Design a protein with these regions (language model features):
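Structured, amphipathic secondary-structure segments that form assembly/contact surfaces
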Residues: 44-155
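Core segments of small alpha/beta cavity-forming domains
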Residues: 2-74
Length: 156
């Protein structure tokens, strides 16, 4: 997965001592990068999306990417991900919650190149709550994903 030069992902504190948690964290990072690469590269058929997503989360990701494509938009800037927290369900499933700071990330019109810069508010911060399940190939796929923009859990 390759991101354009104007799209940056920063992962702060994304370290785990437990092997399973480390694997889930690594695949969550790759899932985020795959989603942004699909949007940035206008690629509705990215093979990385069904690789890192499954179930309802896969449907949600496909809709999210299609929304950008249909509106002729892409992304630009830097998104910071931080405060990852795990909940173990069993050896092959975990909950992963984390925050993102999108205060330096923006939508960009593909046609005009115009960047929609927005003021930094509490809505610039997003709380994510996900479920990840390890498949038969050992890949931690995101099966459920919910987000809350402006959550007090993530705002400074």
């Amino acid at each position: 997965v390759t991101l354009p030069a104007d799209v940056k992902e920063v992962f702060e504190g994304w370290h785990a001592t437990d092997t399973a948690d480390a694997g889930a964290l690594a695949d969550a990072k790759r899932r985020i990068e795959a989603t942004d690469a699909a949007i940035a590269n206008n690629n509705l058929n990215s093979k990385a999306i069904p690789y890192y997503y499954t179930g309802k989360a896969l449907l949600g990701a496909a809709d999210w990417i299609k929304g950008y494509t249909d509106d002729n938009y892409t992304i630009t800037g830097t998104t910071r991900y931080y405060s990852p927290q795990f909940t173990k369900y069993d050896k092959d499933s975990v909950g992963l919650a984390y925050c993102s700071d999108e205060s330096k990330a923006f939508d960009k019109n593909r046609k005009t190149g115009k960047v929609d810069k927005t003021a930094v508010t509490n809505k610039s911060y997003v709380f994510y709550n996900t479920r990840m399940d390890r498949n038969a190939k050992g890949v931690w796929q995101t099966s459920m994903l919910a987000s809350v923009r402006g959550s007090a859990k993530c705002t400074p």
